[in-house]
Amino acid sequence: MKTERVNVNVNNQPYPIYIGENLLQDKSLLQRHVKGRQVMIVSNETIAAFYLDPLKAIYQDFQCDTFILPDGEQYKTLEYWERILHKLASCNHHRDTTLIALGGGVVGDITGFAAACYQRGVDFIQVPTTLLAQVDASIGGKTAVNHPVGKNLIGAFHQPKAVIIDLNTLNTLPEREFKAGMAEIVKAALIKDEKFFTDLENKMSDLLQRNFIFLQAVIKRAAEIKRDIVNADEKERSGERALLNLGHTFAHAIERLLGYGQWLHGEAVSAGLVLAAQLSHRKNLLDFESLQRICRLLTQISLPIHFPKSINADELLSAMYMDKKVANERLHLILLEDLGHAVVSDQVDDRELKSFLENG
């Protein structure tokens, strides 16, 4: 298989995304984006068991330190972020060090935030090992940790020097996590590319069988969609990047109310996508057949299309207001005018939203 490359250029900070097989064995590639002689690999207990030793071997001629997190969203906290910084300082890492995030979205987010803050900013490389991280979390420079009040409330924008996606890491990904990652691919299609959505409908059976040929193609297309949006609006100033939050205002509230880790992020995103589509239909933006197609595709993946019955409408609405997409005390929701055409809207008031959440 030929390695595919997607080039990102954010504010004249270009970096590549590589997508291929056996990239974790490519010494030249993995050393190419390290400018100094120090690296620190951050991973979690689950991923480290599979991939840490081979990656350390690539950097055997470097000062190579490691930090291993427990596995789970509940560890994406200021406490563990501070522990990473302490390890960097105690091991005497300099400004030319490079952090390597080996893992899923939690590892990538907390490592990127540590890199953004250590000595006012050092390099880092994303090596995402989950489908969700490969198509979304590793691209675009958003780094953060959670706070009890809300998800990703404390963070920074800090672009990686490279994103290295080894498709072989998907072989060790549990089925539930693999399917959760599909939600972000569906989201990308809904935002910008109706043809891509149709391709997903036609190829989903092969994708769920982890066919690498099809997976490489859809990961590349999802990465291109995110690349184009991030290039145009790195820090959500113009509203373009906000489109990437389709379904996420609902999803982040669901995750927080259930307790981080009870639902995977992609599972909450799936329910959020359906809520956004249903609300779009209610406001006469999205036709019923398109809504049905979205529900059918997510159901085929075995992802949730309803928010949990244990959460009531008042709780969900209150939690949504802790989202970063609140401006001037109004929720800015991402809605759909069509498959492949998302828009930012502040035209949903609390009364309408509460009625929608209570009655659908």
From Swiss-Prot:
Transmembrane segments: none annotated. Catalyzes the conversion of 3-deoxy-D-arabino-heptulosonate 7-phosphate (DAHP) to dehydroquinate (DHQ). It comes from Coxiella burnetii (strain CbuK_Q154) (Coxiella burnetii (strain Q154)). Its EC number is 4.2.3.4. Binds 1 divalent metal cation per subunit. Can use either Co(2+) or Zn(2+). Its main location: cytoplasm. Belongs to the sugar phosphate cyclases superfamily. Dehydroquinate synthase family. Gene3D superfamilies: 3.40.50.1970, Dehydroquinate synthase-like - alpha domain. Zn(2+) binds at residues 184, 248, 265. This is 3-dehydroquinate synthase.
